[in-house]
A protein has these predicted regions:
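Fe-S-dependent hydro-lyases/dehydratases of central metabolism
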Residues: 1-872
């Protein structure tokens, strides 16, 4: 911590760093014009940056330049149990690697406070219509994840600065919003803005509090945990002015789905967004959090709101201590982060979004930005032909378009009291009119916080949700993360036998193909009250605005408008029922972690038969060998919008998959296969998930008529034999054949899972060439020593007529964003050898990334640094 510009903070016993003065000393009048993000980044530079580069780094912010890297030191790391666990498995493996070479393994410790919340492990095996669902689901979670939870318990005693919130307590982002983020930190007598990175792409949830919170992969999180700076260049900072006021009956979910569509079209990929204007000013923090949560869905890195009175009211409402709330207000006003101090902020680009034009929406059938107004469902071909569906229902059959899953799920919506209370009020009115859930609908309610249950019970609507089948099944991610659990066997068999077009409706944040459930062919995102309405309707063919949900006792038709609660009803009940005491009752005991014994050994005692936790291989064998970048074969040629769900799916493991066959061989019963996500601590299981998504289109796998065959398939060259992806990977591994992947636009969008990069690296992939990369996945590729290259504008796999028979090499000097040459060697139709030289851009974006890549990845770099004594 530096000393220059360190001053007493008026009205407290604390000190702070006067970033305003530091900036004004360089350029008078500049500070007031800085965006919120730049002010926070400038403060941490003044507080922690090497004085030798401080002025240059501040000038980057003042002059809006992107010429030089500067360090970012996040104050905290938050993890969920999937990526958080794999990060700690990596650190445990790093300890072993260091011990094997004579080093001291106990030196490997997080130095930045790290909080791990177990929230990704629970599958909804029992739906919300079972009164004992919560206890049953938790018991199954504990049984299936005993290996994982044993390791996580060990980390609490083996590593310093690691706190664990065990399973059954809520979702990481919601707990971060409601409790963990102080907004303003107080450490060593110094006040400064809270910042954090999290091992999940929805970490920006707490941007709603004015806290820069960024989703990263597990590898980058490990880097931050160990006290390394996260080097960056000034990001694009875009102002988003929210004008107008929402129409009656419009939820924050409707707004965020419309915003996601709008911002995707505006191409804000990688940018830090700052929301302001009358629309932002009038929003509660709950509504703001719904918007910030879906940052990755519109492609941005952060979605900030200024600190204002609404922030202060929320901190008070959620039970923060009065002294802490006072510190947030006084510090924000002192340093110029208060909303009224941001009126002079200048943005190089400002977008304008009118809240008054937002209608009731859903998104689907397979992308969060594919918004559909509920008024247009028939015109879009989603609703319609309801008579046929109802005729099937009358015959005792599951109807066309059946909603087989209806889930109120996800921190996106369950951290917003207005949304959950609205669902409860709609359920109450539906019950009063005699409406019921259709029997084939697996309904569930999984709030991200125990506080939600307390205020819904206080509001008197929890019992109404339970009556309609939306009892609480868990406090975890569940369906939103693809952990929707098994269907009733008879329902599943009918779907298979009749090839029923079945769907899911959920209040989550993602609906990529194959993510929610293997037998839900498509999925739609909707607000919590709409989820309840669709459970009553029972089919997506139902026009939610105009079709009748049923009849009352007098035979009169009931429509959505008849049960939709008014804004006044919702707001009055929220005001009456949500209280600080509820949050204190939940969080005070949860965070009373007490004293912990130190582990007897710094080395983990690996269980050889475990399919969940295994010593990682990253410092040995082929991964320790240099990459050739020569004579590479393509493993896959892929279209636009490849997601990390395509690259390494998270959902349930099926018996006929490569991972399922492996688990069966290891003696695991099929009912305990669990999800791909839960096995990511064991590379032997997890690598079999690489490209295991049945919805994948590998353009190398074509039918005789030239159409692309869907599935987890690859074509092995030079033989041209098509086989399952995992068998192709094994074939190439046995041949020690280096591989390449060719892709289209927006490669790697979606979840921040590092196994989307680890899997391809273990497969032998050395290079990925795409038209564009999503930020987190590109960083993960670098962290695994995979070289990301970007086609120049106007060049792509189609213009080059690539078909997968080629050999590829890369030549040139690897440097940040340097020009390299992709050399493509192939045979022409007349049997001649053709060589094409394709200019590409090296997407190692900083000098630090070049160093990491040259070391073979961050894990190899860590080992080198610890053995050489270059620890943080």
């Amino acid at each position: 911590m530096n000393n220059n510009y360190r001053k007493p903070l008026q009205g407290t016993q604390l000190e702070y760093f006067d970033v305003r003065q530091a900036v004004e000393d360089i350029q008078p009048g500049a500070y007031a014009k800085l965006p919120y993000t730049s002010k926070v980044l400038a403060e941490q530079l003044v507080r922690k940056c090497d004085p030798a580069i401080l002025e240059q780094s501040l000038k980057e912010l003042i002059n809006r330049k992107q010429d030089h890297d500067f360090p970012w030191y996040p104050a905290r790391v938050v993890c969920h149990d999937i990526l958080g666990q794999t990060a700690l498995v990596d650190l445990a493996g790093l300890r072993d690697a260091i011990a094997d070479q004579g080093g001291d393994p106990s030196k490997v410790n997080p130095v930045v406070p790290t909080q791990l919340i177990v929230d990704h492990s629970l599958a909804v095996e029992f739906g919300g219509f079972d009164p004992d669902a919560f206890e049953k689901n938790r018991a199954i979670e504990d049984r299936r994840n005993e290996d994982r939870f044993h390791f996580i318990e060990w980390t609490k005693t083996a590593f310093e600065n690691v706190d664990v919130i065990p399973a059954g307590n809520g979702i990481m982002h919601q707990i971060n919003l409601e409790k963990m983020s102080p907004v303003i930190q107080n450490r060593e007598g110094v006040a400064f803005p809270d910042t954090c990175v999290g091992t999940d792409s929805h970490t920006p949830h707490t941007d709603a509090l004015g806290v820069i919170s960024v989703g990263v992969g597990g590898l980058e999180a490990e880097n931050v945990m160990l006290g390394r700076a996260s080097w960056m260049r000034l990001p694009d900072i875009i102002g988003v002015e929210l004008v107008g006021q929402r129409q009656a009956g419009i939820t924050a979910t409707d707004i965020v789905l419309a915003l996601t569509e709008f911002l995707r079209k505006e191409r804000v990929v990688g940018a830090y967004l700052e929301f302001f204007g009358e629309g932002a000013d009038s929003m509660s923090v709950g509504d703001r959090a719904t918007i910030s949560n879906m940052t990755p869905e519109y492609g941005a890195t952060a979605a900030m709101f200024y600190i204002d009175q609404n922030t202060i009211d929320y901190l008070t409402l959620t039970g923060r201590e009065a002294d802490q709330v006072k510190l947030v207000e006084s510090y924000a006003k002192e340093i110029g982060l208060w909303a009224s101090d941001m009126t002079a902020a200048e943005y190089p680009r400002v977008l304008r979004f009118d809240l008054s034009k937002v209608t009731r929406n859903i998104a689907g059938p397979s992308n969060p930005h594919a918004r559909v107004s509920t008024a247009d469902l028939k015109a879009k071909g989603i609703a319609g032909n309801l008579e046929a569906a109802r005729a099937q229902e009358a015959e005792g059959l599951i109807p066309d378009g059946a909603v087989i899953i209806a889930a109120i799920t996800s921190c996106t919506n369950t951290s917003n009291p207005r949304n959950t209370v609205a669902a409860g009020l709609l359920a109450r009115k539906a019950n009063e009119l005699g409406l019921v859930r259709k029997p084939w609908v697996k309904s569930s309610f999984a709030p991200g916080s125990k506080a939600a249950a307390l205020y819904l019970e206080e509001a008197g609507v929890l019992k109404d949700l339970e009556k309609l089948g939306f009892g609480i099944v868990a406090y975890a991610c569940t369906t939103c993360n693809g952990m929707s659990g098994a269907l009733d066997p008879a329902i599943q068999q009918e779907i298979i036998d009749r090839d029923v077009y079945a769907t899911a409706v959920l209040s989550g944040n993602r609906n990529f193909d194959g993510r929610i459930h293997p037998y839900a062919k498509q999925a739609f995102l909707a607000s919590p009250p709409l989820v309840v309405a669709y459970a009553i309707a029972g089919t997506i063919r139902f026009d939610i605005e105009t079709d009748s949900l049923g009849n009352d006792k007098d035979g009169n038709p009931i429509y959505l408008k008849d049960i939709w609660p008014s804004d006044a009803e919702i707001d009055a009940l929220v005001k009456e029922a949500v209280k600080p005491e509820q949050f204190k009752k939940v969080y005070i005991p949860m965070f009373d972690l007490g004293e912990r014994e130190k582990a007897a050994s710094p080395l983990y005692d690996w269980r050889p038969q475990s399919t969940y936790i295994r010593r990682p291989p990253y410092w040995e064998g082929a991964l320790a060998a240099p990459r050739t970048l020569a004579n590479m074969r393509p493993l896959a040629i892929l279209p636009d919008n490849i997601t990390t769900d395509h690259l390494s799916p998270s959902n349930a493991i099926m018996m006929d998959s490569a991972a399922g066959e492996y688990l069966h061989k290891m003696g695991v019963p099929e009912e305990d296969f669990n999800s791909y996500a839960t096995h990511r601590g064991d590379h032997l299981t997890a690598q079999r998930a690489t490209f295991a998504n049945p919805k994948l289109f590998n353009e190398m796998v074509v039918r005789s008529d030239g159409t692309i065959k869907q599935g987890s398939k690859a074509r092995v060259e030079p033989e041209g034999e098509v086989m399952r992806m995992w068998e192709a990977i094994e074939t190439y591994m046995n041949r020690k054949q280096p591989l390449i992947i060719i892709a289209g636009k927006d490669y790697g969008q979606g979840s921040s899972r590092d196994w989307a990069a680890k899997g391809v690296r273990l497969a032998g992939v050395e290079v990925i060439v795409a038209e564009g990369f999503e930020r987190i996945h590109r960083t993960n590729l670098v962290g695994m020593g995979v070289l990301p290259l970007e086609f120049k504008a106007g060049t792509d796999r189609k213009t080059l007529k690539l078909d997968g028979t080629e050999l590829y090499s890369v030549i040139g000097n690897i440097a940040p964003r340097s020009d390299l040459t992709l050399v493509v060697e192939r045979s022409t139709a007349d049997g001649k050898n053709e060589i094409i030289k394709v200019p590409v851009t090296c997407r190692l974006d900083t000098e630090e990334e070049v160093h990491v890549y040259e070391a073979g990845g961050v894990l190899q770099r860590f080992a080198q640094d610890f053995l050489e004594g270059n620890v943080a």
